[in-house]
């Protein structure tokens, strides 16, 4: 179902407030999204407020944008996003126009998994660079940002249609479908029984994640 209710509005104690941004370092920004939603939960405001997330602020917090969007989505709290990108080296809120298709693909994938994004949608909280001073640069920058998100959406739609991430997760957590894994999920095991199981099954064969191959396959969707 699409994210949002008709009466909801978007807030972000951590993700798009200049006050918060200037008051805290990148290290202390890290837990503030969870703190924001904890405040919403504490006062029973889940039906009234959702979070606005900004890509550049995720960078400052040491997170990926898709990680923060995923966390918000899991709590049904994804209300809007500020579409921009930051400089990975500066440690400040540069609010660049988004041009990284890899990032926008993963961001749009979270939006598709969310069933859409509402009530706020996608906002270009972006600025042209100091050297882009001609009038046409503002138009060209918006075109670049919109095209980047559009290409990200097309790639994300294909990822979702072909169950790229779903199949990876299904395989990774297949051991929870039967045996000891299934019993853990059904609360049939205790710490004592799991300790005993570990002692009796010490030589467990690990499976490779083939992570480099997975990233290579992800690149194929972006071309």
Model-derived segments and their meaning:
Residues 126, 132-223:
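C-terminal extensions of enzymes
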